[in-house]
Swiss-Prot record:
PANTHER family: 5'-NUCLEOTIDASE SURE (PTHR30457), PHOSPHATASE, PUTATIVE (AFU_ORTHOLOGUE AFUA_4G01070)-RELATED (PTHR30457:SF0)
InterPro entries linked to this entry: SurE, SurE-like_Pase/nucleotidase, SurE-like_sf
Gene Ontology CC: cytoplasm
Entry protein name: 5'-nucleotidase SurE
Membrane spanning residue stretches: none
Family: Belongs to the SurE nucleotidase family.
Binding site for a divalent metal cation: D13, D14, S44, N100
Length: 257
């Protein structure tokens, strides 16, 4: 009996035309049947947003051997939900988000539409991976990341991931990658996030900007340290965000009324 090819579902938050997504497709060709359901335009920072106030549509934009590409009017999470409900012929072997234009290390994982894709796949019990490059430009060079993407994806297809666990993989913007580091998420936060401007017709408006404040720049087990030193940062990420260590302490609080 002929073995089925792996079924790979891709999406992103930069849109179906983004270079990162198309480089991801190129890097994964030959590994299985690839189905893409991506937003019809940029949806960066969408996180886990879903569309509930109006209908969502999708359209086929490309089809060739072992590759079918659709664009969707919804969010990145909508794309995964809709693809699983409509266009995939069976349960995917892996869900992949990316390659994102810009890193999703540290707290960025909470804002990221790319990781929204990954978390949605993980919630559905499917092994899921997010790939991101530390370069926001539309013409970013993803070539050095592609061999690692292929290897990591092969390993996930071979071993699988435990229920509730997904991978957040970030690449430094360099042609000379030093290798892979298994990392934890860096502790930090965005500061000075808003640029205020005055409108010529009166009033004010704001652009989201900001800078990242790394609370632990010397932490060699963190993703930011790895990226800053030329390593691919692989961070296992979990769906269950319960702070188990706090549960017993809370039981001692007087919370009843």
């Amino acid at each position: 009996m002929k073995k089925e090819k792996p079924l790979i579902l891709l999406s992103n938050d930069d849109g179906v035309e983004a270079k990162g997504l198309n480089e991801l497709i190129r890097g994964l060709r030959g590994m299985g049947e690839i189905i893409v359901m991506a937003p019809d335009g940029p949806r960066s920072g969408a996180s886990g947003a879903i569309t509930s106030e109006h209908p969502v549509k999708y359209y086929k934009v490309r089809e060739e051997e072992d590759l079918t590409v659709y664009k969707c009017t919804g969010t990145p999470v909508d794309c995964v939900k809709l693809a699983l409900h409509t266009v995939v012929p069976r349960r995917p072997d892996v869900v992949i988000g990316g390659i994102n234009h810009g890193d999703n290390s540290s707290v960025n994982v909470h804002y990221s539409g790319t990781m929204g894709v990954v978390i949605e796949g993980c919630l559905k019990g499917i092994s899921s991976i997010g790939y991101s490059l530390c370069n926001h430009f539309a013409d970013a060079d993803f070539s050095s990341s592609l061999p690692y993407i292929r290897r990591i994806t092969e390993q996930v297809l071979e071993h699988g991931l435990p229920l509730g666990i997904c991978l957040n993989v970030n690449f430094p913007d360099t042609a000379s990658l030093k290798g892979v580091r298994i990392c934890r998420q860096t502790n930090g936060a965005w500061i000075n996030e808003w640029k205020r401007s005055l409108h010529p017709r009166g009033g004010e408006y704001f652009w989201l900007t900001g800078e990242f404040d790394n609370y632990e720049p010397e932490a060699e087990d963190s993703d930011h340290w790895a990226l800053g030193h030329g390593y691919v940062a692989v961070t296992p990420t979990q769906i269950d965000v319960t702070a188990y260590g706090m549960m017993n302490e809370l039981k001692n609080w007087n919370l009843e009324v």
